[in-house]
């Protein structure tokens, strides 16, 4: 029904937001490691 569609939509958005947040934290960790290597 409609609620199932809404639930799927929210789940999909949450999944992609979570992926994006994870990618951003990975990038932040990588830049932190790179900074440590330089010093």
From Swiss-Prot:
GO biological process per UniProt: defense response to bacterium; killing of cells of another organism
Keywords associated with the record: Antibiotic, Antimicrobial, Bacteriocin
UniProt entry tagged with the keyword Ubl conjugation: no
TM segment ranges: none
Superkingdom: Bacteria
Quaternary organization: Bacteriocin activity requires interaction of alpha and beta peptides in a molar ratio of 7:1 or 8:1 respectively.
Functional note: Kills Lactococci.
Protein name from the UniProt record: Bacteriocin lactococcin-G subunit alpha
Species for this entry: Lactococcus lactis subsp. lactis (Streptococcus lactis)
Taxonomic path: Bacteria, Bacillati, Bacillota, Bacilli, Lactobacillales
């Amino acid at each position: 029904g409609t609620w199932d569609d809404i639930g799927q939509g929210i789940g999909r958005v949450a999944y992609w937001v979570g992926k994006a947040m994870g990618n951003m934290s990975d990038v932040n960790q990588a830049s932190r490691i790179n900074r440590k290597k330089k010093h």
